[in-house]
Amino acid sequence: MLNYTKLNLSRMNRLDRKSRLTETTIDQLAKVEQPITWLVITEGWCGDAAQIVPVLNHMALENENITLRFLLRDKNEAVIDAFLTNNARSIPKIIVLDTATREVLNSWGPRPAEVQKMVMDAKAEGLATDDLVLRKQISVNAAEQLHLWYARDKTKAIQNEFLEVASV
């Protein structure tokens, strides 16, 4: 897990330096008038979080009414269990809260829809074989394709999809 965490730190630093919000995103974020909290359930080893968290940070910095907070999934099982994806503790999961009342307004995650489909297809393909070597290769190939997709998308899907549910 430590190797994944180090790799993800590198990814996050790169995205923090290079990712840019779209004008549409900036305009939408400016409309947030009531204080909201984006609670991110994550872990350091999570590759999707490495792609998503820097974008959320940039977005939250655009408006003082948005607070970004983090919970570690494995230390907060009751929270993640209330926000399962396909009966799994998939992360990152972002919960949008009314800051004053702590009412859950919405949630998003663990990844953009197109990437989610890629992950689910790869899981189904891996489960279709009893060959453990092939299953591992499918997993490695899927991870490579996933990060290539994120690089080509340049955070646009994250911005667009999250804004749809982020109460902005």
Segments and roles (model prediction):
Residues 1-35, 62, 81-88, 103-168:
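Non-globular targeting/processing and membrane-anchoring segments
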